[in-house]
């Protein structure tokens, strides 16, 4: 079994928002790393988590599935997910899988942090 090639850094943007910087690959093997980052961010009291995909090298269908799992967990806990830094290729995948309807996608960190703090569609 391969080890996850995913690295994360967690940064508090303000009292309610945390940025999770994601570097490397996002696959099914990334689940422990990303869920751990999610748990740490929520322990810090964040209600809005912004995923920074600027350092993303590769994502496969297992990674998309893992993001859906993360989204379900966030929704159950009344937390919001947003993302920025997606390449055109991965932005298109988010659109094809309709993840962009549940995770707000922004062009950069500044716009992601300034984005709405209330979910758009339910």
Identify the role of each PLM range.
Residues 2-36, 53-55:
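STAS-typified acidic loop motif
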């Amino acid at each position: 079994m391969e080890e996850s090639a995913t690295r994360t850094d967690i940064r508090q943007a303000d009292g309610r928002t945390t940025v999770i910087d994601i570097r490397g690959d996002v696959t099914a093997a990334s689940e422990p790393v990303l869920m751990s980052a999610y748990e740490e961010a929520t322990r810090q009291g964040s209600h809005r988590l912004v995923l920074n995909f600027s350092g993303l090298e590769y994502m496969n269908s297992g990674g998309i599935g893992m993001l859906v799992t993360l989204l379900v967990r966030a929704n159950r806990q009344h937390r919001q997910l947003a993302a920025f830094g997606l390449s055109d290729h991965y932005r298109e995948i988010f659109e094809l899988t309709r993840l962009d309807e549940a995770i707000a996608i922004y062009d950069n960190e500044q716009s992601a942090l300034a984005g709405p703090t209330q979910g758009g569609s339910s």
